[in-house]
Amino acid sequence: MTALMIQGAGSNVGKSMLVAGLCRAARRRGLTVAPFKPQNMSNNAAVTADGGEIGRAQALQALACGLEPVTDMNPILLKPESDVGAQVVVQGKRLTTTRARVYATLKPQLMGAVLESFNRLKATHDLVIVEGAGSPAEVNLRAGDIANMGFARAADVPVVLVGDIDRGGVIAQIVGTQAVLDPADAEMISGFLINKFRGDVTLFDDGYRLIGARTGWRGFGTLPWFPLAHKLPAEDALDIASGPATGGTVIACLTLSRIANFDDLDPLAAEPGVRMVMVQPGQPIPAEARLVILPGSKSTRGDLAFLREQGWDIDLAAHVRRGGHVLGICGGYQMLGRSVADPEGIEGPAGTTPGLGLLDVETVMTPDKRLTRVRATHAGSGLAVEGYEIHIGRTEGADRARPFAIVEGQNEGAMSADGRVIGSYLHGLFGADAFRAAFLRGLGIRASGQSHAAGVEAALDALADHLETHLDVTGILALAR
């Protein structure tokens, strides 16, 4: 038993959650198991203990394995900065920023780093469960591929193909994938499974048998929709919006065009007394919102312009006049100030963009990136806060004399004179249960008193139980070689 790979017949078929569940199931069998994703594209990154960054999904999968996340679990991370360009992070460290066409020429060189990381994990664990990216059916991207079949063949890892029945056409998804694949790539697929079924699973029995007959592949089962999916940290901002939509006090978060590291929202969204609303482009900020969150952004000045295009600057000013609260985290903190200057053109064309003016601070972008885990003390309550920083730029100004937190004896963040507008560089701050409860009380919201970490662990166990009930998990794990 060495490794197996989960690939999708399309994007967003549930690969990340399936890998997390399989990792927990394998761990409960007494195996040492590690997750691995050769290439991920996401602005929702996790900071590793060794000071690197990987996709947030792989950090959750590491938790399912009982491991600390390390950069080898996601050696290539692409962080989009525009519609055509992305930052390339290799084994946790920024390599370059490039356009898609240029990146295609880099991929063959990056396969070495991918295999190096994979082999390190393979040498120290009984099992490595690999997650593909997108779909191998995108055969126009096959040349130089390091994320799907290119990796599977280079590392000789068997593949299970996942189809998403919720979006319809799952027979065509799976049979069609086999039809367009190069025969040598198709031979890497050992079986298939169906994900996200709603209703009576037996109604798909004929379709399930048809897929097996057409492809010759072994079926590993049909998995019903996992009802506790919203209890797990979200990989996509839209996943947060898919949680319970009724009841609770409204906390609104702006869905910026380059939203990043929005895992700050997960502990809040899990609170029964909170209704998290992701404000979509073109929508007004809800007037009933008790708190408005400006999240992290991969392009602060670009998202400031985007925010104004939606009219959210006007909504925010009205929200503050009504006595509402505002929290800006990382890029959102930078936006709250009087200006954001980028004299070297690090995030785009050089220049200065006026901020929202809700905090008396100014930010200057600098080339050096701060990437570290943080233990802090909340300045207002004295409660412990843990999180991480992942940003460029320095923020200074009068409101920093009223800090959000104290980090190693230094002021962190800023607060307005009336205490209703707060900015901080600390991501993950609401994972601290006592602080989260105190913060919510300050908004007039009763906290559940539950441990967020314990809730995530329970959801991972429930996910593994769900897979064990409906899939041939033993058969899937037995494919590893």
Swiss-Prot record:
Signal peptide positions (record): none
Active site: 330 (nucleophile), 427
Family annotation (InterPro entries): Class_I_gatase-like, CobQ/CobB/MinD/ParA_Nub-bd_dom, CobQ_GATase1, CobQ_N, CobQ_synth, GATase_3, P-loop_NTPase
Transmembrane domains' residue ranges: none
CDD domains, sorted: CobQ_N (cd05389), GATase1_CobQ (cd01750)
UniProt feature coiled coil, ranges: none
Pathways per UniProt: Cofactor biosynthesis; adenosylcobalamin biosynthesis
Record key words, sorted: Cobalamin biosynthesis, Glutamine amidotransferase
Molecular function as annotated in GO: ABC-type vitamin B12 transporter activity; catalytic activity
Residue ranges of domain GATase cobBQ-type in the record: 248-435
PROSITE patterns associated with the record: GATASE_COBBQ
Annotated NCBIfam families: cobQ (TIGR00313), PRK00784.1 (NF001989)
Family assignment from sequence similarity: Belongs to the CobB/CobQ family. CobQ subfamily.
Protein task: Catalyzes amidations at positions B, D, E, and G on adenosylcobyrinic A,C-diamide. NH(2) groups are provided by glutamine, and one molecule of ATP is hydrogenolyzed for each amidation.
Protein name per the record: Cobyric acid synthase
